[in-house]
Amino acid sequence: LLFQAVLVATRPTACWVRAVYAFDTASSTEWAFPRTFSADTWVDISATLEIKLAAMACYTSELRDYPHPRSLDSLRYRARAWGNQQCLDAAEVFMTVRRALHDGETPV
């Protein structure tokens, strides 16, 4: 429901959002068949991975023990595995849901 609301709210009109991305959700994204997550955008988080993990540690009700996908160790491994795909130490990945082009722009 939230996903559909975002798509409606970000329709390309006079004042529009340039791009809408979905993010990888540990222990949820992999259960979304047949619409599984397919990363197409990588952001280098090598310098901020430990800050991300410290922030996640504040959400004790969301954390689980390793090897659960939402354990701190699993999140670290996941970020490093995504990063390795682009020769980075760690990365956060996104999937483009919609990308609107400005006048004269061409798709990448």
What name fits each language-model region?
Residues 1-108:
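Metal-dependent de-N-acetylase/amidase catalytic core
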